[in-house]
Regions:
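Acidic, low-complexity terminal tails and accessory targeting/binding regions
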Residues: 1-17, 53, 87, 98-110, ...
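Short basic (Lys/Arg) and small-residue
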Residues: 164
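Active-site-proximal alpha-helix that buttresses catalytic centers in soluble enzyme cores
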Residues: 2-6, 10-87, 91
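Generic structural signal for well-ordered alpha-helical scaffold segments
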Residues: 51-58, 140, 144-152, 172
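Short active-site segment of divalent metal-dependent hydrolases/proteases
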Residues: 26, 167-168
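Phosphate-handling substructures
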Residues: 83-144, 205-208
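Active-site signature of alpha/beta-hydrolase-fold catalytic machinery across serine-
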Residues: 80, 170-174
Length: 216
């Protein structure tokens, strides 16, 4: 009898669970302004969102470790969650947001007015970087390296990953086995929760996406 390939590296091992939490609001969030690698603290609204997410996570299954992007809005969110969970935060530089270059601080409408040809290419092709910035493909390379390290070093654990819209979308694309340009079709709100269980490096099951039921 021919063996059936399931795609599971080790089906008898405990999965590694990643809970992907997007940071809370900053002062740029209400106007949907691009905020790549600029340093922004959480706004009052963002702090409330982070506290609500932290309470939700603390009421759920145990979490073993909190890993965060180094950018302030993520670190602030992670600190609130870690305090609620009784944990400390580990920083991973590769989980930082995409560098949007010259577009930081602008809305999409402003970018479409100022850089019409650049933004048209950027919205079609994840290999296309913004002027002075980083492509989604380059972001994916480092985010996937962070994911590989996590799956190697935290195998069988439940990990809270606090990051940004682009890295979380990239991890969802990887888990779903879909092309990177699927990121253009995903929506993630502030302080949303997403959950992936990994069986090895490649096979994964996505349990939830953009869960904001904990927010007021």
């Amino acid at each position: 009898m021919t063996a059936v390939t399931t795609g599971w590296d080790n089906p008898d091992a405990d999965p590694t669970t990643t809970i992907l939490l997007r940071h809370g609001d900053t002062r740029l969030s209400p106007e949907h302004r691009f905020s790549g690698q600029c340093e922004l603290p959480l706004s009052a609204s963002g702090i409330r969102q982070a506290k609500a997410a932290a309470r939700r996570l603390a009421a759920g299954p145990p979490i073993d470790v909190v890993v965060s992007s180094p950018l302030q809005r993520a670190v602030d969110t992670a600190a609130i969650a870690a305090a609620e969970l009784g944990l400390t935060t580990v920083i991973d530089d590769d989980l930082r947001e995409t560098d949007f270059g010259d577009w930081d601080g602008f809305t999409l409408a402003e970018i479409q007015h100022g850089w019409p040809s650049d933004v048209a290419r950027w919205q079609r092709d994840p290999q296309q970087p913004p002027p002075g910035g980083e492509s989604f493909a380059d972001t994916a390379q480092r985010v996937n390296q962070a994911c590989d390290r996590l799956l190697r070093d935290r195998s069988g654990q439940t990990v809270l990953v606090v990051s940004h819209i682009s890295p979380i979308k990239i991890l969802l694309c990887r888990a779903l086995g879909v092309p990177l340009d699927t990121i253009y079709r995903l929506y993630l709100g502030s302080a949303c929760i997403n959950k992936i269980q990994w069986h090895g490096r490649e096979f994964a099951a996505v349990h939830c996406v953009n869960d904001t039921s904990h927010l007021p």
